[in-house]
A protein has these predicted regions:
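Short, surface-exposed ligand-recognition loops at beta-strand->loop->(often short) alpha-helix junctions
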Residues: 36-48, 123
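Hydrophobic residues embedded in beta-strands of well-ordered beta-sheets
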Residues: 76-77
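Short beta-strand
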Residues: 67-71
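Active-site-flanking beta-strand signature of metal-NTP-handling nucleotidyl enzymes
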Residues: 28-37
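An amphipathic, aromatic/His-enriched active-site/gating alpha helix that lines ligand/cofactor pockets
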Residues: 58-65, 81-144
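Sec-dependent signal peptide recognition
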Residues: 2-7
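C-terminal motif of bacterial Sec signal peptides marking the signal peptidase cleavage site
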Residues: 15-16
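A beta-strand edge to alpha-helix "cap/lid" segment located at domain peripheries
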Residues: 19-20, 136-140, 147-157
Length: 158
């Protein structure tokens, strides 16, 4: 599973390298979410729901750079990319009980359950604290693991 996650992450990070005018994203935050698939839902139902969820995020969170779901057998891997930790905090606010995505988040639990959240990149204690507070509000019990950036770069095609 770790090999799959790191392979997916590597592919995302190098995907913008062929552009002549890439835009650097020095404080990008990447969140890798392991979701446990509800076996009662068909592949087509899952595809339609995740597409709707992705489109909603795309239309409401301008600093969310990517939101992709990946098939991992009994699990689904969701990779979220953010311009910075503030963009990730917008997502946390949106899934909170008063947020614009709270109902959609609750609906998502018909399709999968949360297994683990891994956060990597340019974040500070501010994001860790905000995620902890949000997890308590929403009732997440899955572990959150954090790996801060040491050095490197990320580019976008725009």
């Amino acid at each position: 599973m770790k090999k799959l996650i790191f392979t997916l992450l590597f592919a995302i990070l190098i995907s913008g390298c062929n552009n002549l005018n890439p835009k650097e994203i020095p404080n990008e935050v990447i969140v890798i979410v392991e979701l446990i698939r509800n076996k009662e839902k068909s592949q087509e139902e899952l595809r339609q729901f995740t597409k709707r969820y992705s489109n909603y995020v795309k239309s409401t969170e301008s600093n969310t750079l990517g939101w992709t779901y990946h098939d991992a057998g009994d699990k689904i891997i969701l990779i979220e990319r953010y311009k910075n930790e503030d963009a990730n905090i917008v997502t946390a606010k949106n899934i909170s009980p008063a947020g614009n995505r709270y109902k959609l988040l609750q609906e998502s639990f018909n399709y999968y359950t949360l297994g683990k959240v891994t956060v990597i990149g340019g974040f500070t204690q501010k994001l860790i604290d905000f995620n902890k507070m949000t997890a308590e509000k929403v009732g997440f019990t899955a572990p959150f693991v954090y790996y801060p950036l040491i050095s490197g770069f990320s580019k976008n095609l725009r």
